[in-house]
Amino acid sequence: VAEDTNVWVAIASGSPVGFIAVKLHSEDSMGEIYMVAVDPDFQGQGIGSTLIKFALDWMKDAGMSIAMVKTGGDRGHAVARHTYEKLGFELFPVARYFKKL
């Protein structure tokens, strides 16, 4: 884990079932949800949402005024996008350029 990244782990019955990693970009007053994951056997129980809500509160307490998360636009990330939108995140279009080497 990078020095500027904070990680919290969700535990159920003594075992890890999910985690969230957050980076603070103090120069922009922005907190970034860098990574969030929940064990497939425990998905759909609100663990991811609880981790995200915890991280948002932590970012706010740390003085951040914006929270950001990046995710894929493919079908495999549809549940993640739905969760972020349900928690108040809004889509921000980004231009990405690629060059074949």
Question: What are the functions of these language-model segments?
Answer:
Residues 1-34, 39, 52-53, 58, ...:
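Acetyl-CoA-dependent GNAT
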Residues 27, 72, 97:
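Residue-level "edge-of-site" marker
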Residues 34, 70, 95:
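A cross-family glycoside hydrolase active-site/sugar-binding cleft signature
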Residues 36, 41, 72-74:
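Short strand-loop junctions, especially beta-strand C-caps/beta-turns
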Residues 38, 44-57, 61, 82-86:
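Conserved acetyl-CoA-binding loop-helix of GNAT-fold acetyltransferases
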Residues 52, 75-80, 97-101:
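Short glycine/proline-centered loop/turn elements that form peptide/ligand docking sites
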Residues 59-72:
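Conserved GNAT acetyl-CoA-binding A-motif
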